């Protein structure tokens, strides 16, 4: 989940809060601020979990990532996937506070979050997927 490294959540929040500010003519409703802050944390965490799941064999060989829980065996595949589903489920619960268009966008982005680790294997520039997710 990398909760100890909040920079990823902040990177997700930057464009989100900018869009909310523009959409609200300079004002962000407090409930939207709460929903989107929690959502950014949950989805960034879900993205980290699924990325670590798909990259665990690579992570074992790279010094920077060799201590990640899946790479070391501290967490098994079932636990990681269960956490991923749990984080996605919590994120989905947040959608009850938003409109249908937000639901469609969020669902599409959840698919892209799940696809990014695989995109690294089949695309020359998988950062495009991340760029779409982060925007």
What residues fall within each predicted segment?
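Membrane-embedded alpha-helical segments that form the functional core of polytopic membrane enzymes
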Residues: 16-17, 21-54, 64, 88-92, ...
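Intramembrane alpha-helical segments
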Residues: 68-135
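Hydrophobic alpha-helical transmembrane segments of integral membrane proteins
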Residues: 2, 11-12, 113, 122
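Hydrophobic, aromatic-rich alpha-helical transmembrane segments
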Residues: 5-9, 25, 29-33, 37, ...
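Short, cationic motifs built from Arg/Lys/His that form the positively charged side of catalytic pockets
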Residues: 2, 65-68
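The first (N-terminal) embedded transmembrane alpha-helix
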Residues: 3-22
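Residue-level signature of catalytic and energy-coupling elements of molecular machines
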Residues: 1, 55, 126
């Amino acid at each position: 989940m990398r909760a100890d490294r909040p920079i990823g959540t902040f990177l997700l929040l930057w464009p989100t809060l900018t869009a909310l500010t523009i959409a609200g003519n300079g004002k962000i409703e407090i409930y939207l601020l709460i929903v989107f802050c929690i959502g950014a944390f949950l989805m960034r965490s879900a993205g980290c979990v699924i990325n670590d799941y798909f990259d665990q064999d690579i992570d074992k060989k790279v010094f920077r990532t060799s201590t990640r829980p899946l790479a070391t065996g501290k967490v098994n595949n079932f636990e990681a996937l269960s956490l991923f589903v749990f984080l996605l489920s919590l994120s989905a619960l947040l959608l009850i506070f938003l409109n249908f268009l937000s639901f469609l966008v969020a669902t599409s982005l959840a698919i892209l979050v799940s696809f990014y680790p695989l995109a690294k294997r089949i695309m020359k520039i998988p950062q495009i997927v991340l760029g779409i997710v982060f925007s």
